[in-house]
């Protein structure tokens, strides 16, 4: 009932397409022919063996030996006869499956019939003016429902017949060993030590059920599918692993029984396994792996990966110390290209006004200028020129004579500054040579190239007249009628950003009188 509902869930087009496009009855008929041929072979062998046994018992071999031979071969003769009948039954079942397929193919609506039904339905729906095709459309739809039910019923019937035929095929039974009756009893007693083990019988039944009768284990005879364990020599087959597992199971059972009854014999049995049985199977496995190296690589890959993971833990024992970071040398202070003038430094000795009469004469102008210029400060009071853009081309013409006399001191200041810059450059080179060279070398940008030293004969700094006081001979009084300059005043630029080009001077200041020191 369940299978019928399953087949009913699909439209008839699906069933018809699957049944028509399959491999057909050819493979099933070939299998039936093979089973029939095998059954005839078994029957022929059984007939030949029966004739041989009859001849042995009635001929010159008549006697106890002939009877023993006939008794040993009778189980095998019975197996041949039964195998012949089983093969014939399997062939008949497969032929029944073929017949069921043919019947289903005939009863199944064809794809052409289904396509014609759909075409007719579409045409009638398209020409159904005023409902004149209502009854023909209903008849057409009823016919499609009939084909739907017919297809589902056909597939359900075919499934039932095929399943019953396949399930009724008898299982193949392994052939019995041709052994003498007393030899059979001795072999059974040696393998089972006085009877079959219920655990072995249970395992044999489980194997038979799981494999669908393809693995028949006989614990009493020590065979798998009628063959002894050692008959399976190819590790590439599943039967080799099954035979080895069952053999090891019986070996350990035998060792456990002997260990409690006869420890000496148990030790001998274990030595026999270690020296003769296990090396044989290990050699078979090694030979097979040598012939199939790709399987060996696939088997060893997980183990190698595990070793790699374990070796990676070695990094946890201690971290590699990082090399010390060498600090980058601090950049040198930027030296201005133009040194501050003496007027921008804070004076320390000379007063702003002229000394009184009778006072000690002041130091020479050159000495005072050099003293005040040797102590430069980082922040001057005011720029040396606050009018326009500085002195013009004729600046030398308007310079006082006292300032001209201060030129040697300015040259000395320039030489001292150049020496200081050279010393800083040498210190920087020594630091670079002592620094450790790393993979990523550091490059330092040298932004200060030292003060520009003017060529000989040119002056770029002038001494200031402020704070020098009156000059003249010792013991003479200076003329106080002329006021000393107090500073510079900058006028605001006009709308065109053009200011005065000459400094403002007091109206009563006689430049010639000031230069003469009167």
UniProtKB/Swiss-Prot annotation:
Q: Which GO terms describe its biological process?
A: response to host immune response
Keywords associated with the record: Cell wall, Secreted, Virulence
Composition bias of kind Low complexity appears in 181-196
Q: What is its main location?
A: secreted
User: Is Lyase among the key words of this record?
Assistant: no
Q: Coiled-coil annotation: which residues?
A: none
Q: Quote a single Gene Ontology cellular component term.
A: extracellular region
What ranges does the record give for the region Disordered, renumbered to this chain?
177-197, 346-375, 435-458
Q: What does this protein do?
A: May play an important role in the persistence of mycobacteria in host cells. May regulate the innate immune response of macrophages by promoting the production of pro-inflammatory cytokines and inhibiting the production of anti-inflammatory cytokines. Promotes the death of macrophages during infection.
- Which family is this protein grouped under? Belongs to the mycobacterial PPE family.
Q: What else is known?
A: Expression in M.smegmatis enhances the ability to resist in vitro stress and early survival in macrophages. Macrophages infected with recombinant M.smegmatis produce significantly greater amounts of interleukin (IL)-1beta, IL-6, tumor necrosis factor (TNF)-alpha and an early decrease in IL-10 along with higher levels of host cell death.
Please identify the protein, giving its name as recorded.
PPE family protein PPE11
What's the source species for this entry? Mycobacterium tuberculosis (strain ATCC 25618 / H37Rv)
Q: Which gene is annotated as encoding this protein in its UniProt record? A: PPE11
């Amino acid at each position: 009932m369940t299978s019928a509902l399953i087949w009913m869930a699909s439209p008839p087009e699906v069933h018809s397409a699957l049944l028509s496009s399959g491999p057909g009855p050819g493979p099933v008929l070939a299998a039936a022919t093979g089973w029939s041929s095998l059954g005839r072979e078994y029957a022929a062998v059984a007939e030949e063996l029966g004739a041989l046994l009859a001849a042995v018992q009635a001929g010159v071999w008549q006697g106890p030996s002939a009877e023993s031979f006939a008794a040993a071969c009778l189980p095998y003769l019975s197996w041949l006869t039964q195998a012949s009948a089983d093969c014939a039954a399997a062939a008949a079942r497969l032929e029944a499956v073929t017949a069921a397929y043919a019947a289903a193919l005939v009863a199944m609506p064809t794809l052409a019939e289904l396509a014609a039904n759909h075409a007719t339905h579409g045409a009638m729906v398209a020409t159904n003016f005023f409902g004149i095709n209502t009854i023909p459309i209903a008849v057409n739809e009823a016919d499609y429902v009939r084909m739907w039910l017919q297809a589902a019923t056909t597939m359900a019937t075919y499934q039932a017949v095929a399943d019953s035929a396949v399930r009724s095929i008898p299982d193949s039974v392994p052939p019995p060993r041709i052994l003498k009756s007393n030899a059979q009893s001795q072999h059974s007693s040696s393998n089972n030590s006085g009877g079959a083990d219920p655990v072995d019988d249970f395992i044999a039944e489980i194997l038979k059920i799981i494999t669908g009768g393809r693995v028949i284990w006989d614990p009493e005879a020590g065979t798998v599918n009628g063959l002894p364990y050692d008959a399976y020599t190819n590790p590439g087959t599943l039967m080799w692993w099954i035979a080895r597992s069952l053999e090891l199971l019986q070996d350990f059972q035998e060792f456990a029984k002997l260990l409690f009854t006869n420890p000496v014999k148990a030790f001998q049995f274990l030595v026999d396994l270690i020296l003769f049985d296990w090396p044989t199977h290990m050699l078979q496995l090694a030979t097979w792996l040598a012939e199939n190296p790709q399987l060996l690589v696939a088997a060893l890959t997980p183990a190698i990966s595990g070793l790699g993971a374990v070796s990676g833990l070695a990094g946890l024992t201690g971290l590699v110390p990082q090399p010390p970071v060498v600090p980058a040398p601090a950049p040198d202070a930027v030296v201005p290209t133009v040194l501050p003038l003496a007027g921008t430094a804070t004076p320390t000795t000379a007063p702003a006004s002229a000394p009184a009469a009778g006072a000690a004469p002041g130091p020479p102008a050159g000495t005072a200028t050099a003293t005040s210029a040797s102590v430069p400060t980082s922040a001057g009071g005011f720029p040396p020129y606050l009018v326009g853009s500085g002195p013009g081309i004729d600046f030398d013409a308007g310079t006082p004579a006292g300032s001209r006399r201060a030129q040697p001191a300015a040259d000395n200041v320039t030489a001292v500054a150049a020496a200081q810059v050279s010393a800083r450059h040498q210190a920087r080179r020594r630091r670079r040579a002592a620094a450790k060279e790393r993979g990523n070398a550091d490059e330092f940008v040298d932004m200060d190239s030292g003060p520009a030293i003017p060529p000989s004969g040119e002056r770029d700094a002038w001494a200031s007249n402020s704070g020098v006081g009156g000059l003249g001979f010792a013991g003479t009084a200076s003329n106080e009628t002329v006021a000393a300059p107090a500073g510079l005043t900058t006028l605001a630029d006009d709308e065109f950003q053009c200011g005065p080009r000459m400094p403002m001077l007091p109206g009563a200041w006689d430049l010639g009188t000031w230069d003469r020191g009167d």
